[in-house]
Amino acid sequence: MPAGEAEARAVQDTLRSRVVLDEPGPPPGTGRVTGVDVAYDDERDVVVAAAVVLDGATFEVVAETTAVGRVTFPYVPGLLAFREIPTVLAALESLPVDPGLVICDGYGRAHPRRFGLASHLGVLTGLPVIGVAKNPFTFSYEQPGPRRGDWSPLLDGEEEVGRALRTQDGVKPVFVSVGHRTGLDNACAHTLLLARDFRQPETTRRADSLCRKALREAAA
């Protein structure tokens, strides 16, 4: 774990060169898809991570696991991965099956140093990973059209770092970015398929519910 902010940024800059951006990634509706998410108990400096593996075609749960860890890095925007990565890795490593494509509640390329949680996790595991976030972080975008599937580029200046994707008619968009070993078109296609009933992908919804439940149990 980095000793401070400067060291953490140096780690990001070093690992960023290992991100693979020229693979399309697994096709939607096939294989397995895994949602990862975390929940915090700030008073006790505890973080709980959950990983939920779904069948990519049926959305049935194939496997799920949780891990409990200590928060050992301060809250610094742009460096949140260092608070989450150790516990998320522990959850993924305890899965009894290959996770397939991993979906993070966060960012990949849509990050000031182009190395958010989804990219960090992808480089460390070698897995294809995408980020699907609830807000645009520091980036700009125009509202996509009102219909499900409409999208607009998420921009840092003139560089497209992700997309604002409307997953439900008339509902706020989510913000999709590539993490590792997956293209942006494919990342959006996966997100849209997984968000068939709600704004958030089913993977994220399941992982969020599981980590919150595990945090309550850990605090009991």
Residue ranges and their predicted role:
Residues G31-D41:
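Two-metal-ion RNase H-like nuclease active-site motif
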Residues V102, T138, E142-Q143:
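Feature detects long, helix-prone N-terminal segments enriched in hydrophobes
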Residues V88-L121, T125-L127:
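Catalytic-site beta-strand/loop segments enriched in glycine and acidic/polar residues
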Residues P128-A133:
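Short hydrophobic alpha-helical runs that function as membrane-insertion/retention elements
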Residues E43-D98:
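A glycine-rich, hydrophobic loop/mini-helix early in the fold
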Residues M1-D22, I85, K134-N135, Q143-A220:
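C-terminal binding/interaction regions
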Residues P74-L79, C104-P112, V171-V178:
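Flexible, glycine/proline-enriched loop segments at strand-loop-helix junctions
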Residues Y107-G108, K134-F137:
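Short, ordered loop/turn segments at secondary-structure junctions
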